[in-house]
Structures are given as structure tokens and as C-alpha cells.
Regions:
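Flexible "arm" and connector segments at domain edges
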Residues: 1-106
Length: 106
């Protein structure tokens, strides 16, 4: 039974589908659609990581890292700049080490 997806998939997914004896069709996205599809995939993978149990969390975080890496490459963002910004924000706003939950503020 044919199922429509219309979403970004990993490069080997069509090959894996065909090896399973099924058919599929793909197209290469233009750059602007590709970047948006990566952003959509980032949300999808973050939701999957948030919903994952302990046994699947590492796999889902690996998928999330993959999308972040590819999105940075697609947007020409240097990893060192992101790490520097992470350190800057951690210093100015703190990390999450204290496990604080904000209950209210005036």
C-alpha cells in the first residue's frame, strides 16, 4: 500500500526501501526547501528525543546531532562559532546544572 511522505530522509533510505522489495520515488530539493526541511527534521527529531525512553534516548540524540551538524553545514555555520556562543550563553545566563524550575515571576 502506497504511503505519501513528502519529507527529508537520510541518503540511504531509498536504497533500504528498495532492498526490502518495495518501490519509492525521491527528488532532490532546491537549497531553500532543503534548509526548511532540515529545520522541520530538527523539530521532528527533538520531539522523538523528548518522547524516547532510556533505551532509545542515545539513538534519538544521535539523530538530533546529525540534523544539527547538517543544518550548520547547509547554512555555512562554523561549529566553533556555535560552541563559542554556547559558552557565552552559559556564562551570561547559566546552564541547567542546578535543575531549576521557574514557578512564577513578577
Amino acid at each position: 500500500m502506497r504511503k505519501e511522505y513528502d519529507k527529508l530522509v537520510r541518503d540511504r533510505i531509498p536504497e533500504i526501501i528498495r532492498q526490502d522489495g518495495r518501490q519509492c520515488d525521491v527528488e532532490v530539493m532546491p537549497e531553500d526547501e532543503y534548509v526548511q526541511a532540515l529545520k522541520d527534521k530538527l523539530v521532528e527529531e527533538a520531539q522523538e528525543a523528548a518522547a524516547a525512553g532510556p533505551e532509545d534516548l542515545v539513538k534519538e540524540l544521535a539523530d538530533l546531532y546529525e540534523v544539527v551538524d547538517v543544518l550548520m553545514d547547509a547554512c555555512g555555520i562554523d561549529r566553533e562559532i556555535v560552541v563559542a556562543k554556547q559558552k557565552e550563553r552559559r556564562q551570561s545566563r547559566g546552564g541547567f546544572d542546578q535543575r531549576l524550575r521557574l514557578l512564577w515571576a513578577d
